[in-house]
C-alpha cells in the first residue's frame, strides 16, 4: 500500500556544552504529504510520473500509472486520457489521476503475483478499496485480489489474466541521512517564558547577631529539541543528522556550528540537565530568610528545509528535499531570589552589647 506519511521527531537526550546526542521519536502525521502520491491529470505528464515501457504493442509506448476513481490503468500522451478496465469495457477518461514519485525518492519495484496474491508493500489505488497497481504482458492494469486476477484493457475490451506483477515499495532501508538543514528564522517569534520558581530553601538565624549563610539549590530541568519532518520514513534504521542548533535562550535565534550525530528509532525521552545556583545570604538575628531558585524557559518553532537521503540494502541511494519545523524549549537563565526575611524570635532575649 502507499506508505503513510510519518512524522519524524528527533529528540536530544543528553548533552554537554560541546555536543549533543540525538534520538528519534516517530509518530503518524495527519498531513497527507508524501513523495509517492496521486496528481490530478492536467493534459500533460507531471514530473516524477511512474511509468513502464510497453514493448508488446507496436510501436512501443510509454504507459504512465493512472486511475479513475479507484480503477487503475495507463495514461496515454496520445489522447491525454486514462485507459482502464471496468464493466467488461476498456474505459477512457480525462478525469483522472497520475501516480507521481517525487524525486524518485521511493524505491519502486515490480514483483510477481498470481491469482490474487500480492507481494508485501503493494501500491493500492485507494485507502478504502482493495485494488492494486499491476501489469501483465500486455501493459498496465488493476489487480483485484477478490477476483483472483489482473484486469487490463485490450482493443476496447476488459481482459484478465492470473499471471502478473504488482507495483511495490521497497522498505529495506538501512540508513537515512538529513543534511543541508536551513532554518527560516525571519518572522519567527521566541516565546519567552515567565520566571518560574524551581526550588526553595529557608535559612534560620536564632542567634543574637547577624550571620551569613551560603545556600546552594539545584534542580534537574527537562527541555526538548526536535525536528518534525513531513516525509515517509523507515522504522528501525540508523539515521544521521548534520545540523546546527538555533539558540532561543537569548531570543536571538543564532544557529550554532553544524555537528553530525547518529540516532535510532524508538526513543521518546527528552533532555534533562542539572542546574545549580549558589548565593550568600546575610541573615539578621532572630530572623528566617527564604531563598528561591528561579528559571526561565524559552520556546520557538522554526521552519526549515533539508536534504533527506536513504541508503537501501545493496547500496542504492535516493534523495529528496524535505521541510519541517524545528521545535525547541531551552533554559534561558537561572538565578537566586532572596525573599523578605521574617522574625522568628525576640531580640529582647538577647543580651545588650556593652558600651
Curated annotation (Swiss-Prot):
Chain residues in the propeptide: 19-27
Entry comment on modification after translation: Contains 4 disulfide bonds.
GO CC annotation, single: extracellular region
Subcellular localization: Secreted
MF-aspect GO terms: hydrolase activity; toxin activity
EC code: 3.4.-.-
Chief place where the protein resides: secreted
SUPFAM superfamilies: Aerolisin/ETX pore-forming domain (SSF56973)
SMART domains referenced in this protein's UniProt entry, alphabetically: DM9
Family: Belongs to the natterin family.
Function description: Shows nociceptive, edema-inducing and kininogenase activity with release of kallidin from low molecular weight kininogen. The cleavage occurs at Met-Lys bonds.
UniProt protein name: Natterin-1
Taxonomic lineage of the native organism: Eukaryota, Metazoa, Chordata, Craniata, Vertebrata
Amino acid at each position: 500500500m502507499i506508505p503513510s506519511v510519518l512524522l519524524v521527531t528527533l529528540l536530544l537526550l543528553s548533552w554537554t556544552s560541546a555536543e549533543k546526542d540525538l534520538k528519534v521519536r516517530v509518530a503518524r502525521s495527519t498531513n497527507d504529504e508524501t513523495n509517492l502520491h496521486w496528481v490530478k491529470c492536467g493534459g500533460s505528464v507531471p514530473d516524477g510520473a511512474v511509468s513502464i515501457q510497453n514493448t508488446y504493442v507496436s510501436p512501443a509506448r510509454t504507459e504512465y500509472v493512472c486511475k479513475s476513481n479507484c480503477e487503475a490503468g495507463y495514461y496515454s500522451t496520445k489522447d491525454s486520457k486514462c485507459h482502464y478496465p471496468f464493466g467488461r469495457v476498456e474505459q477512457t477518461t480525462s478525469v483522472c489521476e497520475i501516480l507521481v514519485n517525487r524525486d524518485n525518492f521511493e524505491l519502486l519495484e515490480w514483483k510477481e503475483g498470481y491469482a490474487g496474491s500480492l507481494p508485501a508493500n503493494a501500491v493500492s489505488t485507494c485507502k478504502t478499496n482493495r485494488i492494486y497497481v499491476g501489469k501483465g504482458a500486455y501493459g498496465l492494469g488493476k489487480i483485484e485480489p477478490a477476483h483472483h486476477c489482473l484486469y487490463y484493457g485490450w482493443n476496447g475490451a476488459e481482459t484478465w489474466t492470473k499471471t502478473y506483477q504488482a507495483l511495490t515499495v521497497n522498505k529495506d532501508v538501512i540508513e537515512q541521512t538529513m543534511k543541508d538543514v536551513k532554518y527560516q528564522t525571519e518572522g519567527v517569534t521566541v516565546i519567552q517564558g515567565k520566571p518560574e520558581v524551581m526550588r526553595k530553601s529557608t535559612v534560620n538565624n536564632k542567634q543574637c547577631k547577624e550571620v551569613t549563610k551560603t545556600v546552594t539549590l539545584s534542580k534537574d530541568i527537562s527541555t526538548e529539541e526536535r525536528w518534525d519532518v513531513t516525509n515517509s520514513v523507515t522504522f528501525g534504521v540508523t539515521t544521521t543528522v548534520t545540523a546546527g542548533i538555533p539558540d532561543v535562550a537569548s531570543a536571538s535565534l543564532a544557529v550554532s556550528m553544524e555537528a553530525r550525530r547518529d540516532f535510532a528509532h524508538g526513543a521518546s525521552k527528552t533532555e534533562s540537565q542539572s542546574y545549580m545556583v549558589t548565593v550568600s545570604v546575610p541573615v539578621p538575628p532572630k530572623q528566617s530568610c527564604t531563598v528561591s531558585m528561579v528559571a526561565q524557559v524559552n520556546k520557538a518553532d522554526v521552519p526549515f528545509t533539508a536534504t533527506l537521503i536513504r541508503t537501501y540494502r545493496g547500496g542504492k541511494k535516493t534523495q529528496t528535499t524535505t521541510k519541517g519545523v524545528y521545535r525547541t524549549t531551552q533554559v534561558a537563565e537561572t538565578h537566586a531570589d532572596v525573599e523578605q526575611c521574617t522574625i522568628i524570635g525576640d531580640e529582647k532575649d538577647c543580651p545588650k552589647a556593652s558600651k
